[in-house]
UniProtKB/Swiss-Prot annotation:
MF GO annotations: choline O-acetyltransferase activity
EC number: 2.3.1.6
Protein name (Swiss-Prot/TrEMBL): Choline O-acetyltransferase
Residues covered by region (Disordered): 1-20
Its biological purpose: Catalyzes the reversible synthesis of acetylcholine (ACh) from acetyl CoA and choline at cholinergic synapses.
Keywords per UniProt: Acyltransferase, Neurotransmitter biosynthesis, Transferase
Residues forming the catalytic site: 329
PROSITE patterns per the UniProt record, alphabetical: ACYLTRANSF_C_1 (PS00439), ACYLTRANSF_C_2 (PS00440)
InterPro entries documented for this protein: Carn_acyl_trans (IPR000542), CAT-like_dom_sf (IPR023213), Cho/carn_acyl_trans (IPR039551), Cho/carn_acyl_trans_2 (IPR042231)
The encoding gene: chat
Catalyzed reactions per annotation: choline + acetyl-CoA = acetylcholine + CoA
Length: 637
């Protein structure tokens, strides 16, 4: 969903100047949980769930005890859910980062005519990265303000501080998000360049002076030549970072027994970012294939080993013009990736000739190749990591589709929220493909609050179900009635969005109640061992709106084996959809979903045209505004 517009502001961006994330009333969350799940599970199961929820929320019950403890936690913490959420969403997850966790930004295809063009692009990009880091360090980034629903509120800028200073350290049971800020160690002043599965240290500060683009180009040229020296070739250790987190942690524990490996790991873990110079792939570089290459590198026979997935920002520059960014998601949200990427593309467009004008340093120290000592155990881990990456590559099914029937301008003319409209369209599509609705995740920014990240907008509402059923073929419902149901579904979606962005949704609250019960070493409350709760957090449809102003798009993989990832980028006259699924699942098909989505969007447009030819602004505004903070169950935010 759209969360930010950038404005010059007197605000400092200091998280402490923002309000704390509120804790919703217990009864409100429990009522809303039942409303969200009643139509998604069998009746018998729901009856049992209702009894479990009533017991949990009863006066003097366990729910009240946990709520009281959460309120106490809120007094002591800047953000009561942040640690719980970070561990649950990312650090405890044992799946491999590529496809399963790390989103990517795919740039417009570049037309490089040779290696010098590639290195010039890379030098220009690195120069932009250093400019952007200087803005972050100098607290000179304009404070962002919310747009869309409840526009104008200043947003927490804390996530930007983690872009170049954090690292996701693998652990056998849980990972650690490491902040590099240290009073003892000097600030990192190097970038790691990956080339032909080798890793090189590129110092960006020499003799207290930042390298200009000519210097960077010279160093990148040296790195390219060093990577070609066969007898110096090191094993593709980057493959280990593409594996499951426990496997990578076990391999790393073996690696660090050797001092050479420790030094190499230290240089990577403390770098600003990675720049991955990829080889040509001999692949047709349409949008879908570029998305796949960005998500997993194409596997071991392409550029799958030319990565280090633990680092938040990896800038990929392919010799064939396939370029973009791979993002380790735990330190920050997609909007930060968008803003950084858009800054870099604007910077590069505005400074194409610096390389020619700049004078180079006469004496530049040679870039350093990172070396590895590989025991037989590490060779075994490498082989297993390569096999698992290949399996992931073969399994991922991606369809990037530009829907050109209309864009957000048409939707706005109907006096509807484009995001709510697209969410209802995705529900319509899933229902038409699978004959049911499922728990759906749409990320909602809670950056209005100190250290705010996201909560979940549950888009599979009862109102959406009523609409999609009415649109089923053979329905005797009139167009006017269908239109009324569409309005109701969009209003319900809009209302839930407002609840989520104001800290009143249910997912973070339920997570907090669950985790504080663990901390208190209480027996797991029945609410969280109930089948309906397991269903509620199995997000078969994982969605996110990631709008861009530059020519690029974001995509990611499904979050469950039988699910879809659906990222969308609404523009004035078209909407770009990136739909992913797994080939191993017989139920899902990205191509079928996209084809069905196209039809559903056209049907919704036809319905709007039939019924909204004379949209009365006053009527439609009243319809959308109504009481936007009141849910169907009467709970208020």
């Amino acid at each position: 969903m759209p969360v930010s517009k950038r404005e010059q502001s007197k605000d400092t961006g200091d998280p402490c100047a923002l309000p704390k994330l509120p804790i919703p009333p217990l009864k409100q969350t429990l009522d809303m949980y039942l409303t969200c799940m009643g139509h998604l599970v069998p009746e018998d199961q729901f009856r049992k769930t209702k009894a479990v929820v009533e017991k949990f929320g009863a006066p003097g019950g366990v729910g009240e005890t946990l709520q009281k403890k959460l309120l106490e936690r809120s007094e002591q913490k800047a953000n009561w859910v942040y640690d719980y959420w970070l561990e649950d969403m990312y650090l405890n997850n044992r799946l491999a980062l590529p496809v399963n966790s790390s989103p990517v930004m795919v740039f417009h295809k570049q037309n490089f005519k040779g290696q010098s063009d590639v290195l010039r692009f890379a030098a220009n990009l690195i120069s932009g990265v250093l400019e952007y880091k200087a803005l972050i360090d100098g607290r000179a980034l304009p404070v962002e303000h919310a747009r869309g629903q409840l526009a104008g509120t200043p947003l927490c800028m804390d996530q930007y501080n983690k872009v170049f200073t954090s690292y996701r350290l693998p652990g056998t049971k849980t990972d650690t998000l490491v902040a590099q800020k240290s009073t003892v160690m000097p600030e990192p002043e190097h970038i790691i360049v990956a080339c032909k599965n080798q890793f090189f240290v590129l110092d960006v500060m020499v003799n207290f002076r930042r390298l200009n683009e000519k210097d960077l180009y010279t160093q990148l040229e040296r790195i390219r030549k060093m990577a070609d020296i066969e007898e110096e070739r090191q094993p593709p250790i980057g493959l280990l970072t593409s594996d499951g987190r426990t496997q990578w942690a076990e391999a790393r524990n073996i690696l660090i027994k050797d001092s050479t490996n420790r030094d190499s790991l230290d240089m990577i873990e403390r770098c600003l970012c990675l720049v991955c110079l990829d080889e040509e792939t001999a692949t047709e570089l349409n949008d879908s294939n570029r998305a796949l290459l960005m998500l997993h590198g194409g596997g071991t026979d392409k550029n799958g080993g030319n990565r280090w997935y633990d680092k938040p920002m990896q800038f990929v520059i392919g010799a064939d013009g396939c370029c973009g960014v791979v993002c380790e998601h735990s330190p920050f949200e997609g909007i930060v990736l968008v803003q950084c990427s858009e800054y870099l593309l604007r910077y590069m467009r505005g400074s194409p000739s610096k390389l020619v004008r700049a004078a180079s340093m006469s004496e530049l120290p040679a870039p350093r190749r990172l070396r590895w000592k590989c025991s037989p155990d590490i060779q075994t881990f490498l082989s297993a990591s390569a096999d698992r990456l290949q399996k992931l590559v073969k399994n991922l099914d991606m369809n990037v589709h530009k829907f050109t029937g209309y864009g957000k301008e048409f939707i706005k003319r109907q006096k509807m929220s484009p995001d709510a409209y697209v969410q209802v369209a995705l529900q319509f599509t899933f229902y038409r493909c699978h004959g049911r609705l499922v728990p759906t995740y749409e990320s909602a920014s809670i950056r209005r609050f100190q250290e705010g990240r996201v909560d979940n907008i549950r888009s599979s509402t009862p109102e959406a179900l009523a609409f999609v059923k009415a649109m089923a073929s053979g329905s005797k419902i009139t167009d006017a009635e269908k239109m009324e149901l569409l309005w109701t579904a969009i209003k319900a979606q809009t209302n839930y969005t407002i609840l989520a962005i104001t800290g009143m949704a249910i997912d973070n609250h339920l997570l907090g109640l669950r985790e504080i019960a663990k901390e208190l070493k209480l027996e797991k409350p029945e609410l969280f061992s109930d089948t309906t709760y397991a269903t509620s957090i199995h997000f078969t449809l994982s969605t996110s709106q990631v709008p861009t102003t530059e020519e690029m798009f974001c995509c990611y993989g499904p979050v469950v084996p039988n699910g879809y990832g659906a990222c969308y980028n609404p523009q004035t006259d078209h909407i770009l959809f990136c739909v992913s699924s797994f080939r191993e699942c017989a139920e899902t098909s990205s191509d079928l979903f996209v084809k069905t989505l196209e039809g559903c969007l056209k049907e919704m447009q036809d319905l709007c045209r039939k019924c909204n030819t004379e949209v009365k602004p006053a009527d439609s505004t009243q319809r959308m505004e109504g009481n936007p903070k009141v849910m169907k169950n009467g709970s208020k935010s």
